[in-house]
Regions:
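Short alpha-helix boundary/capping elements
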Residues: 57-61, 89, 104, 124
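Polar/charged low-complexity regulatory segments
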Residues: 2-41, 99-146
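Charged interaction scaffolds used for protein-protein
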Residues: 74-87, 94-98
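Amphipathic alpha-helical packing elements
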Residues: 38-82
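Aromatic-residue detector
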Residues: 52, 94-96, 115-116
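Alpha-helix initiation and N-capping motif
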Residues: 19-22, 61, 74-75, 93
Length: 146
């Protein structure tokens, strides 16, 4: 269910350096450190999409957390990722963004579609046939979209 009193990370659609999800991951790290991240987000810290994003940039998630907590802008932290890990090219970013924005849609082979359906059911959103991806689900569940 929607809870406007919770503090949520930014939209997964938000981009830093043209890369979706990165801003959300940084927000989750910061909110967790400040004890403001909702408890149901804790189990996936450094896993799931966080893990995918850190692997895409080839940085260790725990090292990234340390860097985020040292301070700096999202852009500075992304540049640290590029230096520490790798700097994806324009085509790799396009593939990443397209892949991430569509997670949950027709992803039966790895269980992501079922996971999305479970999240929707837990949030009372099973009736929402327009929520085809996890990104779309986050938008509604976190109150950015109706």
């Amino acid at each position: 269910m929607l809870n406007q009193m919770k503090t949520y990370p930014r939209s997964a659609y938000a981009k830093v350096g043209g890369i979706v999800y990165f801003a959300r991951m940084l927000d989750k790290i910061r909110l967790h450190s400040a004890h403001r991240l909702p408890a149901d987000y804790h189990q996936n810290l450094g896993k799931a999409f966080d893990g995918r994003c850190s692997r895409f940039l080839r940085v260790d998630y725990s090292a990234l957390c340390e860097r985020v907590l040292q301070g700096g802008t999202d852009e500075e932290i992304l540049e640290w990722c590029f230096v520490t890990g790798r700097r994806p090219n324009e085509e790799e970013i396009l593939v990443w963004n397209s892949f991430m924005r569509k997670r949950g849609w027709r992803d039966e082979e790895d269980g992501t579609t079922k996971e999305l359906e479970n999240y929707k059911a837990q949030s009372g959103l099973s009736h929402r046939q327009d929520l085809l991806t996890l990104f779309d689900y986050y938008e509604v569940d976190e109150g950015r979209k109706e």
